[in-house]
């Protein structure tokens, strides 16, 4: 959660430098297939594939369009396009992303395979409930506080929820360029006392956030997949997810909402918090569902894609 990496003073120079360094590192070696993940490795993937005479498979976890919408960086979009054009096969993390790749880059749909992400099984759950600092129900947003993640819609929905459940507490955990605006919006709406902004969480802090929340909300504007809802479900937490997300394709036991429909989002939050039977049913069914959404299943789906590329 948040942005902690530093890629150098010139990101594009770093991407080009990495491509050349990677190509030198593997010079003279033979490969059957090259698999590159997202735009920062696409130039390296293309360079290595050309030198090795091997097919290139590019894996799209997100597009620049997801992160920036119509304000997308043209240079990043150009690098994405180069990788997608050169690749023998493209893998998208969802049908949502598959469609977006087709619309933004005109990549043929029959060139794009879909392999959904998964989540690691959790053997134990640390108990943090005794550490709750609020007597009211807790609603969690955990992610980058950026345009893509829809934080403004979470705040707007929170204001509506508080009209029905005044003691509810909303946690916006994460950092990003929209954080100051969200803090100002919370103040303008007069709901400062009901909001917490703990910043960028790590490790046990993330576990504590999931464990002490009563519901997790992912209101993303454009989410290629979205692993956080699966993580929340692994903590037996009911989740509400944007329909504009890949994870909504694989989840049956989650409430779904268009990111812009803050009235419905608020109604769903209220329903989960005020209807114990609904909450219990969602948790019990999701507990079984999450067992089948794991990384081993994703890996198994990759095998026939590899085989297809290698057969030519």
Name each region found by the language model.
Residues 1-28:
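A conserved catalytic-core segment of Leloir-type glycosyltransferases
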Residues 91, 132-158:
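Conserved donor-binding/catalytic core segment of Leloir-type glycosyltransferases
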Residues 96, 118:
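Carbohydrate-associated surface elements
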Residues 181-201:
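Nucleotide-activated donor-binding/catalytic signature segment of Leloir-type glycosyltransferases, i.e.
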Residues 200-201, 208-213:
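Short alpha-helical donor nucleotide-sugar binding micro-motif in glycosyltransferases
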Residues 221:
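Aromatic "clamp/platform" in nucleotide-sugar-dependent glycosyltransferases that forms part
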Residues 234, 238-241:
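Short hydrophobic beta-strand element within catalytic cores of glycosyltransferases
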Residues 254-263, 271-276:
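Conserved acidic donor-binding segment of nucleotide-sugar-dependent glycosyltransferases
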């Amino acid at each position: 959660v948040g942005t902690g990496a530093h890629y150098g003073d010139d990101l594009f120079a770093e991407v080009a430098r990495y491509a050349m360094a990677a190509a030198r590192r593997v010079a003279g070696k033979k490969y059957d297939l090259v698999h590159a993940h997202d735009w920062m490795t696409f130039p390296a993937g293309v360079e290595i594939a050309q030198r090795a005479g091997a097919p290139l498979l590019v894996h799209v976890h997100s597009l620049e369009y997801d992160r920036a919408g119509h304000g997308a960086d043209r240079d990043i979009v150009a690098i994405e396009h180069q990788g997608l054009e050169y690749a023998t096969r493209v893998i998208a993390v969802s049908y949502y992303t598959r469609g977006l790749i087709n619309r933004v880059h005109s990549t043929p749909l029959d060139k794009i395979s879909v392999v959904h992400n998964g989540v690691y099984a959790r053997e134990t759950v640390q108990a943090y409930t005794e550490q709750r600092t609020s007597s009211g129900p807790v609603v969690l947003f955990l992610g980058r506080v950026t345009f893509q993640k829809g934080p403004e819609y979470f705040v707007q929905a929170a204001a509506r929820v508080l009209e029905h459940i005044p003691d509810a507490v909303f946690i916006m955990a994460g950092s990003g360029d929209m954080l100051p605006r969200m803090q100002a919006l919370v103040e303008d709406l007069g709901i400062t006392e009901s909001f917490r902004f703990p910043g960028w969480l790590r490790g046990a802090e993330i576990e504590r956030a999931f464990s002490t929340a009563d519901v997790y909300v992912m209101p993303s504007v454009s989410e290629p997949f979205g692993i956080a809802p699966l993580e929340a479900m692994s903590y037996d937490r009911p989740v509400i997810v944007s329909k504009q997300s890949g994870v909504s394709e694989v989840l049956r036991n989650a409430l779904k909402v268009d990111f812009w429909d803050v009235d419905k989002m608020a109604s769903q939050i209220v329903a989960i918090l005020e209807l114990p039977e609904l909450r219990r049913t969602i948790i019990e069914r999701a507990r079984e569902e999450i067992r089948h959404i794991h990384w081993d299943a994703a890996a198994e789906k990759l095998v026939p894609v590899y085989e297809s590329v290698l057969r030519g």
